[in-house]
């Protein structure tokens, strides 16, 4: 239900807020002992309606963390092209556009691949498909499942839709 703490839980996992009690462990390590920047750069985060930076091109949105990390420009470009291909979007056609020039489904695809661009071990998804039409939503659910299988990431997916949870998840926690 609304207000039960789903989004708050994601924010605690990536240390945007501090838990009032208890501990959160990742691979047996308390997240409070992990440097916040290091923790967050090892976590992709996808929010409802993409959360793309409107003043940046699609390329800039996808590549921002890799550039902050100082990765090789050629490798960044190749990774961006590979990720675009994985979600069936033509890099030449879309990378120089701005988020406002994309449909809602395209923006969500970019949000997902931006979360994956720095090759994080974990991806947090906070109702990423809730504002989309049923056909786009179903298509993105399938694409996310395929990405999960191909990339082998731990994904924590928040949704109000039990059918969506059953379709995507291999484990479900009900709050």
Residue ranges and their predicted role:
Residues 123-126:
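Catalytic Walker B motif of ABC-type/P-loop ATPase nucleotide-binding domains
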Residues 14:
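Helix-to-loop junction immediately C-terminal to a conserved catalytic motif
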Residues 152-158:
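Conserved H-loop
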Residues 74-93, 146:
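Conserved ABC ATPase "signature" region
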Residues 31-44, 68, 73:
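ABC ATPase NBD coupling module
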Residues 59-67, 77, 81, 170:
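Short helical segment in ABC ATPase nucleotide-binding domains corresponding to the A-loop/adjacent helical element
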Residues 97, 118:
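Conserved signature/switch motifs of ABC ATPase nucleotide-binding domains
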């Amino acid at each position: 239900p609304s207000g039960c703490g789903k989004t708050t839980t994601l924010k605690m996992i990536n240390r945007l807020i501090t838990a009032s009690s208890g501990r959160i462990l990742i691979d047996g390590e308390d997240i409070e002992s992990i440097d916040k920047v290091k923790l967050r750069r090892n976590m992709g985060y996808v929010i409802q309606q993409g959360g793309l930076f409107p003043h940046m091109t699609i390329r800039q949105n996808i590549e921002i963390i890799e550039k902050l990390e100082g990765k090789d420009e050629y490798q960044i470009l190749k990774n961006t092209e590979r990720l675009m291909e994985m979600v069936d979007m033509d890099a030449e056609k879309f990378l120089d556009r701005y988020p406002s020039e994309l449909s809602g489904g395209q923006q969500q695809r970019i949000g997902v691949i931006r979360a994956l661009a720095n090759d994080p071990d974990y991806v947090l998804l906070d109702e990423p498909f809730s504002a989309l039409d049923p056909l786009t939503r179903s298509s993105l659910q399938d694409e996310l499942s395929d990405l999960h299988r191909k990339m082998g990431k731990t994904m924590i997916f928040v949704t109000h839709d039990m059918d969506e949870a059953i379709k995507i998840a291999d484990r479900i926690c009900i709050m």
